[in-house]
């Protein structure tokens, strides 16, 4: 079906990602998955990605082929990450942010009243990298309130947001 859609619509990132998802469901080898994934990003003019070996979920094995070209500006970017019961996913999200080509950043993990061990995970991540700060809201107030609390604490010239269950390409920022 995807090949047929490609003949009708040409190449597109959406079709390539659909091909990637289908290949995962078909349990294609890691090398095949890496080839498809690399092509998606190369076609978009971005650094290609691949999958690291292992048994972790695909999301946790995304990796870049080479280190991204470091950004030259020193403007601080604040990345606000609302966190609610995301202990299992938060490390992948934060590591993808810390691997950005733009290193002049702060990552604000705003714990929004999590009832799992998200706060402890966030605090552990903050001890591993000085660019990570934890803000504790105490009770669940919702993602918008968490983002607003992060904005009040942000020190960056530029501010962006990132969900606690997301992964970012190394050239996002």
Labelled PLM ranges:
Residues 117, 166-173:
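Acidic donor-binding/catalytic loop of UDP-sugar-dependent glycosyltransferases
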